[in-house]
């Protein structure tokens, strides 16, 4: 029986309709084999379980409200699918300390054939030989400390180009969309790190990458829902949102394939990168440690552009919005940069260790606006969490957004206060180092492997924009409302402002670039 492909703007309505279908009757009424009665759970409804409590376009906030009302460890059920929701730093610490391997699976992918988060991807790969091989390759050839030092010049070149684009806009008194310009900077840097060359200006490659990344970002919530309900709906021959997802995935596949072909054609005539050369060697060499396919390479590159590039540019936009809304923080940050870097050169990533307030600003922005608010894993075996038994194959959702705004862990949790990250640890606070209350990039062995690169991108971009420009906005304050419909936390009203070159740095910087 051929699968039925369903696309809809409202996935919850589709699932509700399915619940009343005669075909799905026995599926939805089938009881889980393991009893969850002892685990705290909000009141549920017949058939749909807790679905009615989650009908929100901002799912992380819906889950935060549930935890605030019913507790930090909850059992939720949507139809017959069980979830464990964790919103406590102490519980998260227990899970990632004692059960890290057990929760090292992300479960099934949304759609196997999709380049983004499909069966060929690194992000969605099960914890096993392939994932371990790719993680080692990524760490040793691209994102580890030594590879980041080797690729430092690439990012420095792109930071200068970023500055010059903003300066040109400023001279023309044109406004800029911070997310778009930051995305261009990050994508160009990442592409150069992977391939050793810049995007083709003539072919508008970076614009096409940004467009496709935005399209996939808009589908991120549908990816999440499709993944969560895949096992259940496969019994009915239904595949949620497959058409929409595959259209964008195929476009990305065509673009990445052209990138690979161009790299291969020029391998003999230009300097490549250790990362791409290692990937292609693992693809071609029959005796390699782990034989990968071309789809593996294309999926990995796609995930880099979606995960690293989009998440970093989103974080840059949020941090700049918070800085512009708090003039005293902007001035304090600029003073620190001037005292360490001076006024005759751009801030560089080698300056970051000597800029503690800039580091604090970056961390505070990530605390308030983690690009990915939910950490989703799956228990491979049954275990005990917080004194309660959790059966195997149960989905784990760690609400990092809620944890990083928990008033029990953070004073004035909804306020932008970078100083909180400057406070020295007392003996009492030393104990809190064992509690995970700050995890913008996840935790455990499946945490984001590009977290160090993310800090570099956000730190250098914010540092340059504060060092070199003042910023004009329409109105007194920037609207910090979150956008709906996506899994990433983005701004409902993208930050648009006008850069004004600072006279004290303008001439000296230009003469040195």
From Swiss-Prot:
Gene3D superfamilies documented for this protein:
Cytochrome P450
Q: Which SUPFAM superfamilies match?
A: Cytochrome P450
Give a single Pfam family match: p450
Nucleotide-binding in keyword set: no
* Alphabetized InterPro entries for the sequence: Cyt_P450, Cyt_P450_CS, Cyt_P450_E_grp-I, Cyt_P450_sf, Plant_metabolite_P450s
Localisation per UniProt entry: Membrane
What membrane topology is annotated for this entry? Single-pass membrane protein
Where would you find the membrane-spanning parts of this chain?
9-29
Q: Does the keyword Thylakoid apply?
A: no
Q: What EC number(s) would the UniProt record show?
A: 1.14.-.-
Key words of the record: Heme, Iron, Membrane, Metal-binding, Monooxygenase, Oxidoreductase, Plant defense, Transmembrane, Transmembrane helix
Question: What factors induce this protein?
Answer: Induced by jasmonate.
- Necessary cofactors: heme
| Alphabetized CDD domains for the sequence | CYP93
**Record-level GO BP terms:** defense response to fungus; terpene biosynthetic process
Name a single GO cellular component: membrane
Question: Where does this protein hold heme?
Answer: 448
- Gene Ontology molecular functions: heme binding; iron ion binding; monooxygenase activity; oxidoreductase activity, acting on paired donors, with incorporation or reduction of molecular oxygen
Tissues in which the UniProt entry reports expression: Expressed in root stele, root cortex, root epidermis, root pericycle of the root hair zone, and quiescent center at the root meristematic zone.
Task: Please explain the role this protein plays, according to its UniProt record.
Answer: Cleaves the arabidiol side chain at C15 to form 14-apo-arabidiol and a side-chain fragment. Involved in the biosynthesis of the volatile homoterpene (E)-4,8-dimethyl-1,3,7-nonatriene (DMNT) in roots. Involved in the production of DMNT by degrading the triterpene arabidiol. May be involved in the defense again the fungal root pathogen Pythium irregulare by producing DMNT.
Q: Which family does it belong to?
A: Belongs to the cytochrome P450 family.
Protein name as it appears in the record: Cytochrome P450 705A1
Name its species: Arabidopsis thaliana
């Amino acid at each position: 029986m051929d699968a039925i492909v369903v696309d809809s703007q409202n996935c919850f309505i589709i699932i509700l309709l399915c619940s009343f279908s005669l075909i799905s009757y026995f599926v939805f009424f089938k009881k889980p084999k393991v009893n969850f009665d002892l685990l705290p759970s909000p009141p549920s409804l017949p058939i749909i379980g807790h679905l009615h409590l989650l009908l929100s376009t901002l799912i992380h906030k819906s889950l935060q409200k549930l935890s605030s009302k019913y507790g930090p460890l909850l059992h939720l059920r949507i139809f017959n699918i069980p979830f464990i929701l964790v919103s406590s730093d102490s519980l998260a610490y227990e899970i990632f300390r004692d059960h890290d391997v057990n929760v090292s699976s992300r479960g099934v992918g949304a759609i196997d054939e999709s380049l983004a988060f499909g069966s060929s991807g690194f992000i969605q790969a099960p914890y096993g030989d392939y994932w371990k091989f790719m993680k080692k390759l990524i760490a040793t050839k691209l994102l580890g400390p030594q590879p980041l030092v080797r690729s430092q010049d690439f990012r420095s070149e792109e930071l200068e180009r970023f500055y010059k684009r903003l300066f040109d806009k400023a001279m023309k008194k044109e406004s800029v969309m911070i997310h778009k310009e930051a995305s261009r900077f990050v994508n160009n840097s990442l592409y150069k790190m992977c391939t050793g060359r810049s995007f083709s200006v003539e072919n508008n490659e970076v614009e096409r990458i940004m467009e496709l990344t935005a399209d996939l970002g808009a589908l991120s919530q549908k990816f999440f829902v499709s993944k969560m309900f895949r096992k259940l709906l496969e019994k009915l021959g239904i595949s949620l949102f497959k058409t929409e997802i595959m259209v964008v995935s195929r476009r990305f596949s065509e673009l990445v394939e052209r990138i690979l072909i161009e790299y291969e054609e020029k391998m003999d005539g230009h300097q490549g990168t250790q990362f791409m050369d290692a990937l292609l060697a693992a693809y071609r060499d029959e005796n390699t440690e782990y034989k990968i396919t071309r789809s593996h390479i294309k999926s990995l590159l796609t995930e880099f552009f979606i995960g690293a590039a989009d998440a970093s540019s989103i974080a840059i936009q949020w941090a700049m919005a918070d800085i512009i809304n708090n003039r005293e923080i902007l001035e304090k940050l600029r003073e620190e940069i001037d005292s360490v870097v001076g006024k005759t050169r751009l801030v560089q990533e080698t300056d970051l260790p000597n800029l503690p307030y800039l580091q604090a600003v970056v961390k505070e922005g990530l605390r308030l606006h983690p690009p990915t608010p939910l950490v989703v894993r799956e228990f491979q075996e049954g275990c005990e969490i917080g004194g309660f038994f959790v059966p195997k194959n149960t989905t784990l959702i760690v609400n990092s957004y809620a944890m990083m705004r928990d008033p029990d862990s953070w004073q004035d949790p909804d306020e932008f206060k970078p100083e909180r990250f400057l406070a020295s640890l007392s003996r009492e606070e030393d104990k809190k180092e064992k509690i995970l209350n700050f995890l913008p990039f996840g935790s455990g062995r499946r945490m984001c492997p590009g977290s160090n690169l993310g800090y570099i991108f956000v730190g250098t971009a914010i540092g340059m924009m504060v060092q070199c420009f003042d910023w004009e906005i329409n109105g007194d304050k920037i609207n910090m409302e979150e956008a709906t419909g996506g899994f990433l936390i983005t701004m409902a009203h993208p930050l648009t402002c006008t850069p004004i070159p600072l006279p004290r740095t303008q001439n000296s910087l230009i003469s040195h670039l």
